[in-house]
Amino acid sequence: MSDPRPSQAEKHKLGRAAAKLKDPSRTMQADDYFARKFKAINGSMGPATLNTSSSSEGGGGGGGPANGTPAVPKMGVRARVSEWPPKKDCSKDLACKTLWESRSQSSYESVTSIIQNGQNDQGDRQPEEQLDLDFVEAKYTIGDIFVHSPQRGLHPIRQRSNSDITISDIDTEDVLDQHAVNPNTGAALHREYGSTSSIDRQGLSGENVFAMLRGYRIESYDPKVTGSFGFPDFFPCDTAISPSLHAAAQISRGEFVRISGLDYMDGGLLMGRDRDKPFKRRLKSESVETSLFRKLRAVKSEHETFKFTSDLEEGRLDRGIRPWSCQRCFAHYDVQSILFNINEAMATRASVGKRKNITTGASAASQTPVPVGPAGGCESPLGSKEDLNSKENPDADEGDGKSNDLVLSCPYFRNETGGEGDRRIALSRANSASFSSGESCSFESSLSSHCTNAGVSVLEVPRESQPIHREKVKRYIIEHVDLGAYYYRKFFYGKEHQNYFGIDENLGPVAVSIRREKVEDPREKEGSQFNYRVAFRTSELTTLRGAILEDAVPSTARHGTARGLPLKEVLEYVIPELSIQCLRQAANSPKVPEQLLKLDEQGLSFQHKIGILYCRAGQSTEEEMYNNETAGPAFEEFLDLLGQRVRLKGFSKYRAQLDNKTDSTGTHSLYTTYKDFELMFHVSTLLPYMPNNRQQLLRKRHIGNDIVTIVFQEPGALPFTPKNIRSHFQHVFVIVKVHNPCTENVCYSVGVSRSKDVPPFGPPIPKGVTFPKSAVFRDFLLAKVINAENAAHKSEKFRAMATRTRQEYLKDLAENFVTTATVDTSAKFSFITLGAKKKERVKPRKDAHLFSIGAIMWHVVARDFGQSADIECLLGISNEFIMLIEKDSKNVVFNCSCRDVIGWTSGLVSIKAFYERGECLLLSSVDNRSEDIREIVQRLLIVTRGCETVEMTLRRNGLGQLGFHVNFEGIVADVEPFGFAWKAGLRQGSRLVEICKVAVATLTHEQMIDLLRTSVTVKVVIIQPHEDGSPRRGCSELCRIPMVEYKLDSEGTPCEYKTPFRRNTTWHRVPTPALQPVSRASPVPGTPDRLQCQPLLQQAQAAIPRSTSFDRKLPDGTRSSPSNQSSSSDPGPGGSGPWRPQVGYDGCPSPLLLEHQGPGSVECDGTGEQEDLLEGGRLPETKWHGPPSKVLSSYKERVLQKDGSCKESPNKLSHIGDKSCSSHSSSNTLSSNTSSNSDDKHFGSGDLMDPELLGLTYIKGASTDSGIDTTPCMPATILGPVHLTGSRSLMHSRAEQWADAADVSVADDDPAKMYALHGYASAISSSAADGSMGDLSEVSSHSSGSQHSGSPSAHCSKSTGSLDSSKVYIVTHGGGQQAPGAVTKPYHRQGAANKYVIGWKKSEGSPPPEEPEVTECPRIYGEMDIMSTATQHPAVVGDSVSETQHVLSKDDFLKLMLPDSPLVEEGRRKFSFYGNVSPRRSLYRTLSDESVCSNRRGSSFASSRSSILEQALPNDILFSTTPPYHSTLPPRTHPAPSMGSLRNEFWFSDGSLSDKSKCADPGLMPLPDTAAGLDWSHLVDAARAFEGLDSDEELGLLCHHASYLDQRVASFCTLTDLQHGQELEGAPELSLCVDPTSGKEFMDTPGERSPSTLTGKVNQLELILRQLQTDLRKEKQDKAVLQAEVQHLRQDNMRLQEESQTATAQLRKFTEWFFSTIDKKA
């Protein structure tokens, strides 16, 4: 009791008083109000002196504590002492209570007068401290009195609200549950609607003192007296702290954290006169109490509340002690376990009940602002049941200033208007200065296949669950869900384990579960290890969950024995702060595990209720919205999109407090499910309407209690602001505004306004986009509201409620479910069988913990490149994730899959980790601990496939060349043997991550090349390839999950697969073409085992696709390398569109057939299938001229195994496309000509190096060049590039390129490459979709350096067909089965499927693209396949139509294209297709009747027929519309000279896809299905074109048309495509005349439209989709009619049967009568 300083409470009171001086009238009014309340509740407790008008009460300013004795309340403390449960260490409260009873309200004045009279000197400190303590304790007493007053019976906690969040689990008798009455106002806390749930967070802690002061702040001083004082006199505070009124105001506003005897400014520096006094001693001196009081105390004092925090702060200030962190060797199970802090648990233990009732949710925004004086703060409006705590609301929050036409900036709320994405701290193009997008949130990010930071939860992912785990992050990710809560259920429940409960003196009630399990460590062949799984729970909401290897625990017992270690030693090591002595073994009752499940899973809820308010034009207020009696058509349309209307009466699923028995809450409501969640919407217009009640309480009682509310605005509605809403429960508003309602162009804008303490949540709203009405938008919105609800539960209000509930559960367990047994120290586990007598002994190893499956944690400092700052973080590395949690915000700021880590550069105290495409994370250890970095590197070696980087200084040769090619991804595609680069150690497949200290991830390909060309000294940091020569790639590159996954509706038909947004820019790769490409399908390097995804990977792995034409620039400036585009993972939903390769792990972009489209396939799950697919897809027969190139490498191997016959090198195929535009220059860089035959050579069959694999596919545009003199590849001579309208991306044009024949060597590579490329190019076309017809040929140009010459011919082949059409055939690995519906459903229209590139979901039967495996691969097999496909039975897939349709055989096509081209011969020589081609089955594209050019004739290719397809089986085919797979694949052609050249073309992009290949056959002209809805004029044009087949141009045109038709058929053809097709018709010469040098122009022509192409395509697709939907509707109607007829027929049949029976009976009777009559007569 010796603290000589003024108490915090005094200062607080004074500060408030100062604020009040300005407005005496208001003060009096308020005081009267409070006095009345006070008297009402406490009977005689409040003396008349409470009236502020009585100046005598002031105590004359100088009065001391003796100033008057207040009447003691007879029903006050004394009457209720018996109610206060005794609690140890509680003496202080009683002391205060007694003090309170002995003094009057005037004691408040005494405090003021003491200070006013200058009693601040040392001499007066003792009494002053006494006053302080009395004062504080008195306050507690008041709080207790209120809580335990007779009003307690009104405790409304159980009826507080209809919300699911109600704390009904809390025992009403709980001493902490004292919120029945608000101590500040004396009013019952139960409120109406929204306010019902505001939790009055006022407990028995010292905070009540300040709350009381606010309630009676003026009563104790006489305004006349105080008015005469100058503020300086009035506040003679220590000048070091608050020498001015400003400081006083700060104190009153709570900006100083107050603890008696201490001051913290901003929680930082210790301020106070007794700072010199040891922190602990100060606290100790203040807590002296008598034992009597201690026994009667109900709660610990304020000082004890802060005791631990104070110690902590002292430690930080004086000794720099780090915050608590778990043992390094403990492997955390999930993110929240890493955030577990036992210090916080101790610090908050006594403050669980110390919660002030504050205004929350929308009510905080709508509160009436109060004039602010010098020391002012917010006051609650009179009559409010909530007291606005000035400390909680220091300055009125002004909001974030973000407004638009949907939502206005609002105090206490934060708005999301678009463009807000996940925080990015790594160095990548997105946050580099050169990033042009300027948007932190792109389409891709909103549909990212990556787990968002807030979506990361469980870090320990079992090997067998990894593919499934990855599947879960597809599409929109559910965030802020503690999935780790299932830890106990998964690892303890139903298994032998031990539970211990107890009440720790520092931590309060605790519960520990521990289990010893045997863990097989695949890395340790010599034996198994034991693992201890631990779950440690305190009153904090975070739980310590994880495991520790037995070898990592120091113990007196031997490790690895059957007996195990003493549990006591394990617990003492893991949680040294826990008092083991307090623990008792849990009772052997089935209730114990059940209670623990409830406790752990308390925060999990998969049922949410969402309010929907309807805002008409001109409206904005709550009342107006509630009073809209009925819904308008726009709102009805929106509701129909969002969910299904259900009849409430008898409804058995989640009803969200709606009446399902008597219809008292309306007859119908809106219900839906999303993922694992059930959502019931409280729709304002479906709830009961009361004409005489403007407040519409029947509606508001539901919607006002919903945490998340959707505000639907019609056009013309005023911007929404939470200020207009009165509810403490509504924390998040999702505003949806409709545009063009009830039209075909209906679309929606979305905005969000969330309470400031609700953390941000996804999916992010892309900037400047509107969402077309689609399933994608529905999923986006549902994910948004689910995440909003989950995030809101992290706000202070709900956390406080959950914490109280949790504490009650724990207390119950510790008191009622324990035995007397303590923690066993004998190390005997009853569940360990004695049978295993052999004592496995695993010696304790150093760094044993680094082999743990869970997340090992280190304290690091990370560089935030987004904000150019260093942040302290916790680094966690598990077997699945690497993540960073910022210490200050406790938020995950970075996460990536361990499979995405490709390498690292480690220093003594820092490490730079590279992941995915070379993005980099820079970390340094805290306190320069080099041991941490060593451990981190070791851990990375164990859990990732990366390696240490190598720095090289490269020299130039005499020509200034560096001697290698690099593609757009930074992967070395070719190295000149024995050149300087080769001697320095650079090898094919190496990945450049830094060039001259600049991160490659931040550079475009052009910038990369410029750096390499212009730097005098070229220093590069490279990541070496895998042992098999394949480049290191992130799993997300190889197995990118499609941005938009196919979503199947309930009927199994895919919902529209369309981009969810409407935007002018192309959706595909939005910001950075280069990047996307990367992800694109580069094959997975590395061994199959590499990733779980592996199989997929492997496929992908097959090729390193060269950037393949990544070089080429689309008109919009983006580079669309086919491969990139097609497979780039980032292509947004549509981005990869057909390509989707992105999807596949295979990641092999171009060639790999693998690219499974199916998102599913992407996941490993598909892997096996994919592999099969690939294998199947591979053209076994195809002869890869050389050993199969690495492209396939892994798959190739498979394929080869399957079809040993593959002779042509797959890489060729893959190259084809690339080469076309590969930069000729690239060759320059190489300078060596070796590359020319590198194809065969480098990619020898065994060679993983397949250029494709390597990514050799050169970036088109010579990007491959080391940058030396690469010139962007342009089409060389253009043979007559075919512009496929659809851009069938006729790769074949590539063939033309060859025609160039300019480089024979090129040709060599090309043929195969061309093919593969093409197919894949078309896939790419998706990228092309952006409008560039995409010179596919560029792709081919990639030819590994050899092509460097970039034979012009290759370029020409660019057939600009927009790649988009996408070759993306997808073959599902499923292999035997047809993709569902692929074949059968016309709807898919392969075109559509292919096109889904754009992200459409197919509306009808098309199988989900995800399934399709890679069809793209064709390009890989591409040429072969294509050719073979052509040959293959066109009809294989089954549609005669498609057969008919199929395109010319490749040979013919080639001949037509370049009848005399020597290249052809060369190509042929290379492929020697016929001979080599084995009759493997070609991939069939499933023929849908619609596909126009499905394969035409088997042609000589029959042999190739055995393309993968067949192997794959129809189901593999993703899109059935096209001809059989084989058609999909580039057909193989005989080496016939002309044919050979064609080989690489990929024919049409999706539309024609395989058809294209078939198209070659001049004999048959494909006829589209009449139902296809083709434009006959186009058909006629096509026919004419056919007639002119002999001319290459015509042929090109024809192909064009065909592809165009195909697209149309697919009905996915975009408008631009159509237009393009028309243009082509108009100017056939257009496609052919492109100048060889105009490769770019070539692209551009088609491409010029590219900027708008995507939008056009999207619109077109939407139109098509609508048509399909209309057709579907009609079909359904017809079906209904037919069903009705059937019903009638059944009824007629029954009637006839009845009549027949009746007639029979009558006949029988007649017969009987007749015979009986005769008998009688007889």
UniProtKB/Swiss-Prot annotation:
**Which of UniProt's keywords are assigned here?**
Coiled coil, GTPase activation, Phosphoprotein
**Biased composition regions of type Low complexity, renumbered to the chain:** 1091-1103, 1120-1131, 1220-1237, 1331-1355
GO-annotated cellular components: glutamatergic synapse
Bias (Gly residues) occurs at 57-66
List the residue ranges of the region (Disordered): 1-29, 44-72, 362-405, 1068-1246, 1331-1360
Residue ranges spanning the membrane: these are: none
Q: From the Swiss-Prot or TrEMBL record, what is one GO molecular function term? A: GTPase activator activity
Q: Which residues form the Rap-GAP domain?
A: 596-813
Instruction: Please give the biological process terms from Gene Ontology that the record holds.
Output: presynaptic signal transduction; regulation of small GTPase mediated signal transduction
Q: Which residues form a coiled coil?
A: 1652-1712
Which portions of the chain have biased composition (kind: Basic and acidic residues)? 384-403, 1195-1218
Phosphoserine-modified residues are: 149, 380, 384, 1030, 1245, 1461, 1472, 1478, 1488, 1549, 1552, 1591
Gene3D superfamilies, from UniProt?
2.30.42.10, 6.10.140.210, Rap/Ran-GAP
Q: Kindly give the InterPro entries that the UniProt entry links to this protein.
A: PDZ, PDZ_sf, Rap/Ran-GAP_sf, Rap/Ran_GAP_dom, Rap1_Ran_GAP, SIPA1L_C
Q: Where's the PDZ domain?
A: 951-1027
Concerning PROSITE patterns, the annotation shows: PDZ, RAPGAP
Record's signal peptide: none
Query: What protein name is recorded for this chain?
Result: Signal-induced proliferation-associated 1-like protein 2
Q: Which gene encodes it?
A: Sipa1l2
